[in-house]
Amino acid sequence: RLADEGLIETLARNEWARNRISIELLESIFLDDSDPVYDKHIGKLRELGVDIAIDDFGTGHASIIGLLKLNPYRLKIDRQLIAPIADSPSQRGLIKSIIDIGKSQKIQVCAEGVETREHLEVLRDFGCECLQGFYFDRPMAAHDLVDYIAKEKWRSNS
């Protein structure tokens, strides 16, 4: 879909989309084998105020050069890398390094798969800005989200 001119044209026609949309690209299909058409469209998306995020980081074979070239707004560390941090010092070191790389490039880093209090504490200690996972709650319907926020239920797990 990223190569689809219709996507760019539709977003350009809709003012509401500016600065409200984030497109997540899978690390495994984009970073190392980027196409000039993709590069052009990503530039146009940025001009329209669309944030670019890399999803499932750590599961593909991306290079640091690919990361620098794309310069995403957000880098989402895959849950497979987060799961073992409670028991593995080497895994914690790897996650800390990824977070530090993101920070050095002014990229927001988001950890997916936060499922325990220990995950939360380790990632907070590392300065991870965005945490996502079942520790906070399960997915829910939009109409349930309004009540959840109003009653501040989310505060009990943070």
What are these regions (language model features)?
Residues 1, 20-33, 50-158:
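EAL-family c-di-GMP phosphodiesterase catalytic domain
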Residues 4-6, 14, 35, 150:
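Serine/threonine-rich low-complexity intrinsically disordered regions
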Residues 6-9, 37-47, 96-100, 122:
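Alpha-helical scaffolding segments of alpha/beta enzyme cores, especially the outer helices
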Residues 6-20, 42, 68-71, 124:
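Acidic (Asp/Glu)-rich catalytic clusters
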